[in-house]
Amino acid sequence: GGGFSRYSTDGQWLVPHFEKMLYDNSLLVMAYIKAYGSTGRKMYGCVAEKILEYVRRELTDSQGGFYCGQDADSDGVEGKYYVFTREEIREVLGEKAGRDFCRQYGITGHGNFEGRSIPNLLENDNYEEICEEPWGNGDHGGNICHGSCDTIGGRENEECRRLYQYRIDRARLHKDDKILVSWNSWMICACAMAGAVLGEEQYVDMAVRADAFIKSHLVKEGRLMVRYRDGDAAGEGKLDDYACYSLALLELYRVTFRVDYLKRAAAWAEIMTEQFFDRERGGFYLYAKDGEQLIVRTKETYDGAMPSGNSVAAQVLYRLTRITGDVIWQKVLEKQFCYLAGAMDGYPSGHSYGLLTMMDVLYPAKELVCTLSSGSDTERRRKLAAQLANLAVTAEGLTVVIK
């Protein structure tokens, strides 16, 4: 079915906590896309594509927003949706195909999880080839996996398709169908990066639709809301919402070079700085200054399940400085790093995203400026953007600007 569960519950990485979350899968797409762009290793690109196919199929609202995730339980039993008995496999696939499938994916009579089996490739030496195979479920993946399998691979993917349908018919998982600005922003970044590196417009389209959803449903009176569900947008936007959404718009600019994305990113970053930034000591507060009046306005710097709002804000400020050359952004960025420096020095592993941004600042960066005549048509600009987008995402320390 694609997608990553939250974490492993054992040292063998066999039994997951079966819940799947949008933010985990967003960050993993970006990691795999970076790995693929750096190494050219096919498996990394395939894994990213299969995550995105899972998100498109299971976690995407009809209007383009992304849901939070899927629960671990079905019919009150954790993991029931994902496990099989050997008899079920043979019943669905037939005796011979079922026997071969069980051998391939480690499905046994005694099982590996409460008497049933979690299909896995832990003891299969061909795991990398299998991971590179496209799905045979009628869905169209990207150009990395598509058409790469041989006859055996095609047969196995047909078997996976049949088992996937059987699994859906047997029991469906509950979805957390809230749509959060910050989580959606990370998936927008992931889709945009994947589209640029893999050369697949469909992933950029997913990012564009999600942005349009936020713009239409999660902005009230010029300010961001936190979440949307069943026609209702609620919660005043916090630092994470403004920082992550600004970053998502900058990522869309980086892969499309449409100036409106850059302008909107700068506009949201201005609100973020005005409402959340501590101009005396540096750092961004978690809550806006015109929001609910609290006894203490807190700041958070350490990365948890997702990068901290302060670290993401630093990345936004860095990109705006590089792209626009505006000293206003540079001054705020310098003060931000003065604030973050002590925390990053004292607990480096808890501030990895901030450290990555600091590396961007400290190591010499290059700028590639491409100019088009004022009469250049939209199609010519689009083609140039597509050619440069891969370079903009994969090349470390490079800023690409079209003028």
Residue ranges of predicted features:
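Glycan-recognition and catalytic cores of secretory/periplasmic carbohydrate-active enzymes
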Residues: 1-403
